[in-house]
Amino acid sequence: MAKFKTNHFTSLQGSKEIIRTNGMKYTVRQNRFRYFFPDEWMTFYDALSSKQKVTFNFLINTGARINEVRNVCVQDVDFDRNSIIIKWTKARNEDGSRKMRVLSVSPQFIKWVRATIKEYELKPADHFPILSTPAANICMKKTLRKINIPDWLMFSVHNVRKTLETWLISLDVDSLKVSKHFGHSITVASKFYVSPDTFNFEDKRAIRDIIGELYYHQGGFR
């Protein structure tokens, strides 16, 4: 049975039921800002199947939304410059077209992408085998429950995006680079993401083990 370090989220578990004026009921999470601590992520990732790992490795290494990742083709990966072009984005240009975003990724992730392309025999125009959003959310909750994360209900795939941004901030990566990477303003980042003091030295070393040399040469923690 996995045993995790105590963290400040343990008192923010649970959900509450909301009743609409039409009588319909739905539930909302008490804590929508949950992110993974590195020991939680490593245990979660190790419990996934090989196919499931493709989705979640893309998410944690890019910080992209799952719909953005699902629309990435092999030809969108720049193997020489360690970057990925995101063409299907949430942000729009004035003419209504989607605003393209280029994401830096680590050389370690690029190496993994090459191996994945070979394993699945993908061609330049092929998409990567990314799970649907409902399937990814179900997979995440089932796996987190299996590995005994007490507040597993607080997670959705979007929390992986929150996790990478939180990690990069904790590593003291330049805030402008972080905001450009995730496609939102520094104000949004400071409002919804945590301070660098959340993680200790051991946590930060573990984060580097997970995300490799992503923004490694931009100063901050190494």
Which residues does each PLM region occupy?
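C-terminal secondary-structure termini that scaffold catalytic or DNA-interacting sites
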Residues: 2-21, 208-222
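Short, polar N-cap/turn motifs at the start of nucleic acid-interacting alpha helices
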Residues: 76-79, 173-194, 221
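Catalytic-site neighborhood detector that most strongly recognizes the C-terminal catalytic loop/helix
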Residues: 90-92, 182-207
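Short, basic (Lys/Arg/His-rich) helix/loop patches that form interaction surfaces
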Residues: 46, 121-126, 138-180, 187
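Short, charged phosphate-coordinating catalytic segments
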Residues: 2, 59-81, 176
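Basic, Lys/Arg- and aromatic-enriched nucleic-acid-binding interface segment
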Residues: 24-66
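Conserved tyrosine-mediated DNA breakage-rejoining catalytic core shared by Y-recombinases
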Residues: 38, 71-112
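C-terminal catalytic core of Y-nucleophile DNA break-rejoin enzymes
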Residues: 92-115, 122-142
